[in-house]
Amino acid sequence: MPATRRRYSGEAEVSGLPSFELRPGVAFPDWAAVTSPAAVDALTAILSAFDLAKNWSGYDDEEDRVRQAVIEGLAELDGGPDAEWIAARTGLDEGRVATLLGRLAARDLVVRDGGSNAIVGAYPLTTRSTEHRVGFGGKVTHAMCAVDALGTGAMFDADVVIESRCRACGGPIRIATKDRGIALDSVEPEPTVVWSGNRYEGACAATSLCTVIAFFCSEAHLEEWQGANHPGAEGCRLTPDEAMQVGRALFAPVLTHAAGAVGRMA
């Protein structure tokens, strides 16, 4: 992981758009990252699905610390973190960590296995195999969806290489970032687009919303897939850059601090 992190500018709060203070000086989402009307629409739909006001009400510093540790563990550990690892990482008692993990799962910020109760994800990352592989820092992990993959670099302040597949034909899609994860360096194939669908069920985005946010190698393949699988479904067609804007807005604030603060990650 990078030794130093980009400081958060504090410019994310935009009047009239849903936002809350994630930690002092850091607003979620970072609306300053979103410049395209289509990206604004997609981000607004995602926040509406998650019910920002309800599900984030009362979110506190201990939950924030545990959530950060879970995400860092998903990036660092092959099998993901457990309560013991998180306790060592955060300095919190293991019993307290267990309670906080339950609260985060209820908010749909941590995803657990229905049988073993093991941690299997925290947006944007998951231990489960998905079509979105994200490589950085000598490690490869999986992202929940296309937007999550595109936001991972900004979250970790690192350039990433995304290897995914067209949801329609299965053809390979490769995207590389630059400027420490906040801009696109290359997109192959060039006509690649992202579909950001609207579907939230069972209080779990990983098994609903994330399944309809995907890469397509061309607009024609997106249209074919929609016609065959989701005719009339609501959502937004995004360019890779627009989808990255949404990913940055959602995930750049997750591990960062306000300008002038000391970075959390070592």
PLM features per residue range, with description:
Residues 2-38, 141, 158-161, 172-266:
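Long, low-complexity, charge-rich intrinsically disordered regions
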Residues 37-68:
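Short alpha-helical segments that sit at the start of domains
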Residues 57-63, 114-137, 179:
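Short, cationic-aromatic polyanion-contact patches
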Residues 76-90:
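Short acidic, hydrophobic short linear motifs in intrinsically disordered regions
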Residues 166-169:
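Short cysteine-rich clusters marking metal-coordination/redox-active sites
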